[in-house]
Amino acid sequence: MKKKHLITGITGQDGIFLTSEILKNNPKDVIIGTSRNYNNSNFKRKLNVLMNFETDDKTIQVAKVDLLELTTVKNLISDTEPDYIYNLSGPSSVYKSLSDNNQTYREITTIFNNLAIAINDSNLDCNFFQASSSEMFAPSLSALSEESKLSPRSPYAEAKLQIHEKLQLLKGIGNINYSSGIMFNHESEFRGDQYLVMKIINFALKVKTHKKEVLKIGSLDLIRDWGYAGDVAEAIYKINVENESEDYVIGSGVGHRIEE
């Protein structure tokens, strides 16, 4: 039976890989995507890099939607009636959240709250996946798990923690399976130029062409778990198609110093 998948933030790297993952497993399913800055040709070009078959506008439907407006979100949910929802939307820069007067915090929490209200009001029977973040974790020298201590140190992480706590309260209510993926850093060829790995790659390319550039980054001693966005999207898909309400850490399990 044909299923409908709603992906918020579909044009980001995770959304692109997730779209590909869903259609590889279920080519007849329908994907509904939302984006604040949708460029059809750019999105299709990136998707075609990953897929070996063409899609049409009936299979993938993407629209500019303001998820900060509750009425708009209610209409989106009632009109589409998705079987699976993946909330990947919202600001993703920890650094910017430190100086944007809580805009990042407000946007992340408002988008989730609007989706939760709309789902509840529509009496949907669906699976919901929330993109959470390893930024919630307290500093630790040992391996982290779903049971590790949470201690956010930025407005971005605080927003993710608030949603994480709300999810625990929502589990078991109604016909919704609420899951979350506590994701570590992950990169791909579709990552934005403002992020560390792409900064380093672009710097190397400019140096190769003899352009004078200065690479500005933070401490080289920081240790991060970097994975591949394609692997993360595969995990997201597998988590949400299971009829369970669980939290999962998604990472490579290996830390690397930035200097490496």
PLM regions and their residue ranges:
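Conserved Rossmann-fold NAD(P)-dependent oxidoreductase catalytic core, especially the SDR/UDP-sugar
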Residues: K4, N87, N113-P155
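Active-site YXXXK catalytic motif of short-chain dehydrogenase/reductase
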Residues: G12, I108, Y156, K160
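NAD(P)-cofactor binding segment of oxidoreductase domains
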Residues: I16, S20, S99-F128
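Conserved internal alpha-helix within the Rossmann fold of NAD(P)-dependent oxidoreductases
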Residues: L70, I111-N113, I236
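SDR active-site strand-loop-helix element
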Residues: T8, T34, I85-S89, F128-S133, ...
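N-terminal Rossmann/SDR dinucleotide-binding element
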Residues: M1-Y84
